Swiss-Prot record:
Its EC number is 4.2.1.104. Belongs to the cyanase family. It catalyses: cyanate + hydrogencarbonate + 3 H(+) = NH4(+) + 2 CO2. This is Cyanate hydratase. CDD domains: Cyanase_C. Gene3D superfamilies: Cyanate lyase, C-terminal domain, lambda repressor-like DNA-binding domains.
Length: 148
């Protein structure tokens, strides 16, 4: 059986060949475009139905299904420091604005953290003053620190 890394390479190649967008794949799966990307990148575990749909949509061999059903190994895929400019800017945003976001969040919610397990991530495009802008939303469950 192939691993998630090989599965990602095969899946992304097929996506490019078929000229599919993440939006199209997400709609086909009944999921958000970011979650669809997570499935093809191997960052999320597909359900039986999702695996079947991906295999059909991308014309993949049925033998790849078990790899989609495997639980992913969630280790950082990026070097530190990040070398990709886009990903570096995401890190930069957290490094620069993290203390401020944390302070505002604690004022709103109290002492805790936002779950990155129970989270939904959305990427959207808006036009503001005739310029495209990216809207990045992390919608995560708030987890309070325990008291004992």
């Amino acid at each position: 059986m192939i691993d998630k890394k090989e599965l990602r390479e095969i899946s992304l190649k097929k996506k490019r060949e078929k000229r599919l967008t993440w939006e199209e794949i997400g709609k086909y799966l009944g999921r958000d475009k970011v979650y669809a990307a997570m499935l093809l990148y191997g960052y999320a575990q597909a359900t039986e139905e999702e695996a079947d749909k991906i295999i059909t949509l991308l014309d993949l061999p049925k033998e790849l299904k078990p790899a989609f059903l495997d639980a992913p190994m969630r280790t950082p895929a990026q070097p530190w420091p990040p070398t990709d400019p886009f990903i570096y800017r995401l890190y930069e945003g957290v490094l620069l604005y993290g203390p401020v976001i944390k302070d505002v969040a604690h004022e709103l919610f109290g002492d805790g953290i936002m779950s990155m397990i129970d989270v939904k991530i959305y990427v959207d495009k808006v036009i503001e003053n005739n310029y495209p802008r990216m809207v990045l939303t992390f919608n995560g469950k708030w987890l309070y620190y325990s008291k004992w």
